[in-house]
């Protein structure tokens, strides 16, 4: 029976979704604010498909959570579970462009060969110290503490570096007990501290000038275009849901700022 979700703030219903506690923490952080559902068409609130052999089909479910509020244009989370192993959380909190705030980004992916962890407060204007310095001063000590406890994820592609801060938490960790312990003891508290840092910045943010807002908007659009063009989940989503649906989801829901 297909789950019916009436709006983007309705609870995610994926059974045994690995990353549920991270989204729960995000929802809790927003609970002290007046929020509204972000407009997401029903076809993207819940999507179900099957993959594998006809004799042993496996279910894949994707649900999208989202909201908006003062200072936040869009907060949204793509939640996917495919079979028993593959599990994805792609969370982006996008500020309105008349506040000098970074994006909050968390990509947590479980695949048969391990977990990929990416966590950051991502700049819209990386080379602008007025946009970055107050963020990085708060975030760098948090990053240094937690990155030292997990393996590195490897080199960042050169064309992507402008979209990450120096406090980008990036790791590849194994499946099994070791990975489970790292997620519980390191990734979750690191996520909580990054999220708290973002919300501290959010509370303190003051409205900017029209000229500054225009600069921020251009930076945000550039970031969104890059994320849409380079989305690493594109191939997986196409295999599950087809090309047309996937391209609409990426360009009109996940990275929709034009």
From Swiss-Prot:
It is an enzyme of class 1 (oxidoreductase). Gene3D superfamilies: 3.40.1500.20. The keyword Oxidoreductase applies. One of its GO terms (molecular function) is cobalt ion binding. Its EC number is 1.3.7.3. GO terms for biological process: phytochromobilin biosynthetic process. It comes from the Bacteria. The keyword Methyltransferase does not apply. Keywords: Oxidoreductase. InterPro entries: Ferredoxin-dep_bilin_Rdtase (IPR009249), Phycoerythrobilin_Fdx_Rdtase (IPR022827). It catalyses: (3Z)-phycoerythrobilin + oxidized 2[4Fe-4S]-[ferredoxin] = 15,16-dihydrobiliverdin + reduced 2[4Fe-4S]-[ferredoxin] + 2 H(+). PANTHER family: PHYTOCHROMOBILIN:FERREDOXIN OXIDOREDUCTASE, CHLOROPLASTIC. HAMAP family: PebB (MF_00793). Catalyzes the two-electron reduction of the C2 and C3(1) diene system of 15,16-dihydrobiliverdin. Belongs to the HY2 family. This is Phycoerythrobilin:ferredoxin oxidoreductase. It comes from Prochlorococcus marinus (strain NATL2A). The lineage of its organism: Bacteria, Bacillati, Cyanobacteriota, Cyanophyceae, Synechococcales.
């Amino acid at each position: 029976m297909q789950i019916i979700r009436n709006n983007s703030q309705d609870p995610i219903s994926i059974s045994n979704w690995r990353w549920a506690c991270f989204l729960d923490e995000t929802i809790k952080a927003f609970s002290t604010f007046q929020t509204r559902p972000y407009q997401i068409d029903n076809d993207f609130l819940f999507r179900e498909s099957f993959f594998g052999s006809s004799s042993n089909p496996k279910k894949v479910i994707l649900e999208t959570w989202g909201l908006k509020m003062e200072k936040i244009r869009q907060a949204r989370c793509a939640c996917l579970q495919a079979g028993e192993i593959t599990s994805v959380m792609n969370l982006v909190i996008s500020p309105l462009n008349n506040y000098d705030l970074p994006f909050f980004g968390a990509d947590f992916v479980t695949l048969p060969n391990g977990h990929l962890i990416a966590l950051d407060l991502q700049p819209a204007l990386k080379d602008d110290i007025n946009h970055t310095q107050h963020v990085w001063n708060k975030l760098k000590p948090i990053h240094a503490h937690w990155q030292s406890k997990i393996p590195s994820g490897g080199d960042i592609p050169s064309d992507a570096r402008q979209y990450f801060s120096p406090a980008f938490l990036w790791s590849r960790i194994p499946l099994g007990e070791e990975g489970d312990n790292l997620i519980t003891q390191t990734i979750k508290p690191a996520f909580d501290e990054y999220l708290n840092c973002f919300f501290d910045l959010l509370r303190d943010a003051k409205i900017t000038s029209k000229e500054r807002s225009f600069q921020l908007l251009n930076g945000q659009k550039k970031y969104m275009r890059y994320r849409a063009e380079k989305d690493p989940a594109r191939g997986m989503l196409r295999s599950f849901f087809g090309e047309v649906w996937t391209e609409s989801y990426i360009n009109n829901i996940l990275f929709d700022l034009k």
